[in-house]
Amino acid sequence: MSFNNTDIAAFKDVWVFCEQRQGKLMPTDFELISEGRKLADELGVDLCGLLLGENVEGLAKELGGYGADKIYVCDHPLLKNYTTDGYTAAICQVIEELKPEVMLFGASNIGRDLGPRCAARLHTGLCADCTHLDVDMPIYKDFLREASTLAPEKIDGMNSAMVLGEKHDVSRDLKMTRPAFGGHLMATIICPRFRPAMATV
């Protein structure tokens, strides 16, 4: 069976790649778990960590104490030290099987190497060096009426599906914000047609 990354409804959960070096977690792991927790709570899904290495079960327990709902571990002697090909193959195999909706990598040397390779292999999008992450979630017209500077008749005409007090379905897309044009502009990027949406942070 081939991997279908366009069946958006088949994907769920927010995942964080947890980087370890010589049996020690990196400080960015905890920052990513914190950011992933916010996204997972907003989406109403689990936050999962993905840890690769050899004899890293103890690190998995440590990560669980920082807010991850689940930790997936790929434990093998060949994963003891980082290699681009080995880690890419292992991560892509797990993603193809378990289908996370969002996948976050740290903006470290390893994350910047690994994230784009996984995205290319899985034929999905990745936004590098994000400074802010958010989720495009259902909104309510009554909230718009209170918070918007638009006239009420403009709100009423925005979308026939937006009935007062009822949800308006939107995409649940990960909104990834990053500097563009030499830092003179902040661009928000989405990956609307493929999953998982990937980012380095």
Model-found features: residue ranges?
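N-terminal glycine-rich FAD/FM-binding segment characteristic of electron-transfer flavoproteins
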Residues: 1-201
